[in-house]
Amino acid sequence: MASAGSLDVPERGHQRPFLIGVSGGTASGKSTVCEKIMELLGQNEVDHRQRKVVILSQDRFYKVLTPEQKARALKGQYNFDHPDAFDNELMDRTLTQILDGQIVAVPMYDFITHSRLPETTTVYPADVVLFEGILAFYNQEIRDMFQLKLFVDTDSDVRLSRRVLRDMKRGRDLEQILTQYTTFVKPAFEEFSLPTKKYADVIIPRGVDNMVAINLIVQHIQDILNGDICKWQRGVQNGRSQKRTLPGQGDSGGLLLQGKRTHLESSSRPH
């Protein structure tokens, strides 16, 4: 992606992108997993207009807050983890345009002021799009666009510690962070995000630390980029994928197999 400028860039021949949804709780490592996939595919060094794989975050689609909502947000009293916090109409429209091979201007969001910025980021046509967010699977219309759904399953204590460190870097005090977590973040995860885990085709315990899972996913994205998309599309109709099982560490096969949803290893501790 690039900061918005001229959009009159010659488009590549239209080929419907392979859309991968990546969900999981706050600070579970979703964006880190996506970034590691990009790194292993060698896409970080490629010009943004020529990248075959791009990452898009659900965080960019937070609604514009009213003055009253923004005042509450600055006090840590607004629920950003609720489905109603997102502009699902804009999200749906943007993903549809991306699937149609269009060059798209995507909103930018300031997490310090809780504001949608006037600047946008340009997303150019790509072969594979990774869309990550805490509620990426919550809305059915959006969920059904994904041809592959990954759920990053990280221990709740680890997620909390990461959240504290991240929010303190954004200038928030510890008491506000913990109050927001217990009041909004944890209940919203249990009510809205965790139940969508059942829609995942692949569950990735421990996030980016689980390199067995990451390497297998990278391997199959390479298959897609090499034109061998049929490995993924067996059983896929109208953007929906059946539950599949990836080969385990001791397996030599490289195909995704239809069957139960993949859980690449047991979580060390349940949520």
Curated annotation (Swiss-Prot):
Keywords: ATP-binding, Kinase, Nucleotide-binding, Transferase. ATP binds at G24, G25, T26, A27, S28, G29, K30, S31, T32, D209. The keyword Cell cycle does not apply. Residues 246-259 have a biased composition (Low complexity). It comes from the Eukaryota. Its EC number is 2.7.1.48. It catalyses: uridine + ATP = UMP + ADP + H(+); cytidine + ATP = CMP + ADP + H(+). InterPro entries: P-loop_NTPase, PRK/URK, Uridine_kinase-like. GO terms for biological process: CTP salvage; UMP salvage. It holds the Pfam family PRK. One of its GO terms (cellular component) is cytoplasm. GO terms for molecular function: ATP binding; cytidine kinase activity; uridine kinase activity. Gene3D superfamilies: P-loop containing nucleotide triphosphate hydrolases. Pathway: Pyrimidine metabolism; CTP biosynthesis via salvage pathway; CTP from cytidine: step 1/3; Pyrimidine metabolism; UMP biosynthesis via salvage pathway; UMP from uridine: step 1/1. The keyword Transmembrane helix does not apply. Residues 262-271 have a biased composition (Basic and acidic residues). Substrate binds at D81, Y109, H114, R163, R172, Q180. Residues 240-271 are annotated as: Disordered. Phosphorylates uridine and cytidine to uridine monophosphate and cytidine monophosphate. Does not phosphorylate deoxyribonucleosides or purine ribonucleosides. Can use ATP or GTP as a phosphate donor. Belongs to the uridine kinase family. PANTHER family: URIDINE KINASE. This is Uridine-cytidine kinase 1-B. It comes from Xenopus laevis (African clawed frog). The lineage of its organism: Eukaryota, Metazoa, Chordata, Craniata, Vertebrata. The gene is uck1-b.
